[in-house]
């Protein structure tokens, strides 16, 4: 029986991971880290002490915010433990910590734990190369409570397009248009964010040319999709060598390259 710990147990994803874990026969949630009171009554250790969390699990699943994730990674540097990191918008500090931790333990980091999004990302890479002269626009939609924009998944997709086309994303990405801005630049990659209602997540990558266009879409209808993906990723990363992996590695789409 594999023991998993949840870092961020009071959030929407932490709660869903605990619920979904009850459907797995080969794991147990053995510890939950949370600063806020839980709205459910788990049958495991609940703590706000990282040491206690780490001591009572085989791997940690993190869904928090930037500061919480960075605190976890800083602790993990001197207390290696397999980590499944789902927190997005980590910034340069968080990304550097991920790489540093990857030298001491197996870490899987994914801005989206969905199998469908992994396939969307793979198709986006292929389309970006084949349709090199097509304009690319990315649109993401989420619920009104989402705090960061663009979503981590949208940024991953944008990076995929830029890498496939040999572009520097920071130089070609835009996040909105307003006023007399002139014609669209040739290599521009637009990433647009919409917020409203209770939309779990929708991502669209469009390739547009004169006379034709193609759009690749993924819609998540339940957070259980991400929760189940995170649990499976945590089970996978436990058996890997030290390194920084992503969801494509877990699914066998490519080997670890970082």
UniProtKB/Swiss-Prot annotation:
SUPFAM superfamilies: Glyceraldehyde-3-phosphate dehydrogenase-like, C-terminal domain, NAD(P)-binding Rossmann-fold domains. It is found in: Cytoplasm. Disulfide bonds: none annotated. One of its GO terms (biological process) is lysine biosynthetic process via diaminopimelate. It catalyses: (S)-2,3,4,5-tetrahydrodipicolinate + NAD(+) + H2O = (2S,4S)-4-hydroxy-2,3,4,5-tetrahydrodipicolinate + NADH + H(+); (S)-2,3,4,5-tetrahydrodipicolinate + NADP(+) + H2O = (2S,4S)-4-hydroxy-2,3,4,5-tetrahydrodipicolinate + NADPH + H(+). Pathway: Amino-acid biosynthesis; L-lysine biosynthesis via DAP pathway; (S)-tetrahydrodipicolinate from L-aspartate: step 4/4. Belongs to the DapB family. This is 4-hydroxy-tetrahydrodipicolinate reductase. It comes from Campylobacter hominis (strain ATCC BAA-381 / DSM 21671 / CCUG 45161 / LMG 19568 / NCTC 13146 / CH001A). The gene is dapB.
């Amino acid at each position: 029986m594999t023991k998993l710990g949840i870092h961020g147990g009071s959030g929407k994803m932490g709660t869903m991971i605990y619920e979904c874990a009850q459907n797995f026969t080969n794991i147990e949630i053995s510890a939950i880290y949370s600063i806020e009171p839980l709205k459910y009554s788990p049958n495991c250790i609940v703590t706000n002490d990282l040491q206690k969390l780490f001591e009572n699990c085989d791997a940690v699943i993190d869904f928090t915010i930037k500061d919480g994730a960075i605190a976890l990674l800083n602790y993990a540097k001197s207390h290696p433990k397999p980590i499944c990191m789902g927190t997005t918008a980590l910034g340069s500090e968080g990304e550097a910590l991920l790489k540093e931790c990857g030298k001491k333990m197996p870490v899987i980091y994914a801005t989206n734990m969905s199998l469908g999004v992994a396939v969307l990302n793979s198709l986006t890479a292929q389309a970006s190369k084949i349709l090199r002269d097509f304009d690319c626009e990315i649109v993401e939609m989420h619920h009104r409570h989402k705090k960061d924009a663009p979503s981590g998944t949208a940024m991953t997709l944008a990076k995929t397009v830029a890498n496939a086309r040999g572009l520097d994303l920071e130089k070609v990405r835009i996040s909105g248009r307003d006023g007399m801005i002139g014609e669209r630049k040739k290599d521009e990659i637009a990433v647009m964010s919409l917020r409203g209602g209770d939309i779990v997540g929708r991502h669209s990558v469009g390739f547009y040319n004169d006379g034709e266009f193609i759009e690749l879409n993924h819609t998540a209808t339940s957070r259980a999709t991400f929760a189940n993906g995170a649990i499976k990723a945590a089970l996978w990363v436990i058996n890997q060598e030290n390194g920084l992996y992503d969801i494509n590695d877990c699914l066998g789409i490519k080997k670890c390259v970082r």
